[in-house]
Regions:
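Conserved class I S-adenosyl-L-methionine
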Residues: 1-7
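Conserved SAM-binding loop
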Residues: 38-39
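A short acidic, Gly/Pro-enriched loop at the edge of an enzyme's catalytic core
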Residues: 59-68
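Substrate-binding/catalytic lobe of Class I Rossmann-like enzymes that use SAM or dcSAM, i.e.
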Residues: 104-204
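Conserved beta-strand signature within the Rossmann-like core of class I S-adenosyl-L-methionine
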Residues: 96-104
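Conserved SAM-binding loop of SAM-dependent methyltransferases across substrates and taxa
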Residues: 12-21
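Conserved SAM-binding strand-loop segment of SAM-dependent methyltransferases
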Residues: 45-58
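A short glycine-rich, Lys/Arg-flanked "PGG" loop and its adjoining helix->strand segment in the class I
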Residues: 83-95
Length: 206
């Protein structure tokens, strides 16, 4: 089978899939650093015959896949491009294909993102409400087979990220500065609480 990982990041999911299944995995990213790292890891692990990393936009792809996954990328698509995103997923999927889209979301009605996060952490980022995602999925001709809602799982993830951030405080300050470190410590702590007590969840659409 052929698997596509949209927004493959540092390649961990694509590598795990290639290791555990007899399939060909294509991972795409817009980051030159991530692309270089993924290429290096595929060679180190002797998985070059199964892994194919590309430095490109998902909208430029033009081939068919049995499975499509995307983890942590949809938050960067932008509301006005949701229809285009799912239309492209529909175009790239084989007739009997399955897609899994994993994204942070909100249990509240649609609203503008927090201005502090937009300015300092994720310019252009957006966490959608459920209603904002299901409609473009349907309009793209895809079928929603399952929606899983995860909340507390991600609060634990954020807690670990925050702890790792604090452990590496001096390294981070050397790479950037103390202001950068304090912003990210504040951001991770706030997001941990938003998942634990607030309106933030993780949606997995199949």
């Amino acid at each position: 089978q052929k698997v596509l990982d949209i927004g493959c990041g540092w390649g961990s999911l694509a590598i795990d899939i290639a290791k555990s299944a007899n399939c060909e995995v294509t991972g795409i990213t817009l980051s030159q650093n991530q692309f270089n790292y993924c290429q290096k890891k595929a060679k180190e692990l002797n998985l070059e015959n199964q892994l194919n990393f590309k430095l490109m936009d998902y909208r430029e792809l033009d081939e068919k896949f049995d499975r499509i996954v995307s983890v942590g990328m949809f938050e960067h698509v932008g509301r006005k491009f949701y229809r285009k995103f799912f239309s492209q997923v529909e175009k790239l999927l084989k007739d009997d294909g399955v897609s899994l889209i994993h994204t942070i979301g909100s249990v509240n009605p649609p609203r503008d993102p927090h201005p502090w996060i937009t300015k300092y952490i994720f310019p252009g980022g957006y966490t959608p409400s459920l209603s904002e995602v299901t409609t473009p999925i349907e309009k793209a001709g895809l079928i929603v087979a399952d929606i899983e809602v995860l909340r507390l799982h991600y609060s634990h993830t954020l807690r670990h990220w925050k702890e790792n951030c604090i452990k590496n405080k001096e390294k981070i300050i050397q790479m950037f500065d103390e202001r950068f470190f304090r912003m990210w410590e504040f951001y991770l702590a706030g997001c941990e609480m938003a998942f634990k007590w607030g309106d933030q969840v993780v949606y997995q659409f199949q």
